Amino acid sequence: MDYYFTKGKPQLVNMKTPIYLVTQFQQLMDLMQNQYEVSCLELMQRSGKAACDFLVYRWPKVKKISIFCGRGDNGGQGYVLAQQAKKMGMVPTVWQVGHQMSMSKPPQMHKEVWYEMNSCHQQGIVLHTYSPDIDLGDPELIVDALFGVGLYGHVRPEIALLLQRLQQFTVPILAIEVPTGINASTGEIAGNALAATATITFLCMKLGLLINDGKIYSGEIAFDDLLAPEAIYQQVKGIEESSLLDSSTIFSKKIWYRNKTQKGWQLSIN
């Protein structure tokens, strides 16, 4: 079953959008790769393309976008989005945070992220190494691909300063997976956080997007199941429906859905 959030309470609908903690989400990812043989690279590409699809659907007139990529898998999703955006006629600029372009894989970077970073370079997408004193230009939209669900502990001081800088822009901000600085399980702020206009999340809905600070910082929510088989949600159970129905912390949200049975995005209107 799926959930639309209306007047603060989840209403059951005919799509499956399970709600999970990060540890359960990671189990789903492991199943997708090990049992259903969908590679990490394929999942990264599916999610990056879905993020770009939603961006175009939600903001069809946007042309100049700035994508802030961390060195983890969330950054890899940002690199995929950049490539897709260029194919669709946009002008993407990538800001590399905590790393820089390299012809050899850095020790702490997953090979899939390095592959997508180099694919951007080969396609002529401008890659900038971020520094606090650099001019960020005048983007029409900002993409947050810094950490996703991979943030542990508090946001580092230099990242906190970047988030404050980005928050000063008056353009839409699209977060991939989870806004930077928000705990994907608890919805709490990890020191500092970037408030998104919209957040696109994948495979399952993360509880932290719907409760506490996360319900505000996530903005509108888009969900894409990455073509996951329905059986996977029986293998790893999410949050019990009863616990959601009894919760007073669930916030009325605008949520966009797309799964393998749909060609476009469907909006839950609260």
UniProtKB/Swiss-Prot annotation:
Catalysed reaction per UniProt? (6R)-NADHX = (6S)-NADHX; (6R)-NADPHX = (6S)-NADPHX
Required cofactor(s): K(+)
MF GO annotations: metal ion binding; NAD(P)HX epimerase activity; nucleotide binding
Positions annotated to bind K(+):
74, 144, 180
The UniProt record gives the binding positions of (6S)-NADPHX as 73-77, 148-154, 177
Q: How is the cofactor bound?
A: Binds 1 potassium ion per subunit.
* Alphabetized UniProt keyword annotations: Isomerase, Metal-binding, NAD, NADP, Nucleotide-binding, Potassium
Top-level division of the source organism's lineage: Bacteria
Q: What is its EC number?
A: 5.1.99.6
The family annotation for this protein states:
Belongs to the NnrE/AIBP family.
Q: What is this protein called?
A: NAD(P)H-hydrate epimerase
Q: What organism is this sequence from?
A: Legionella pneumophila (strain Corby)
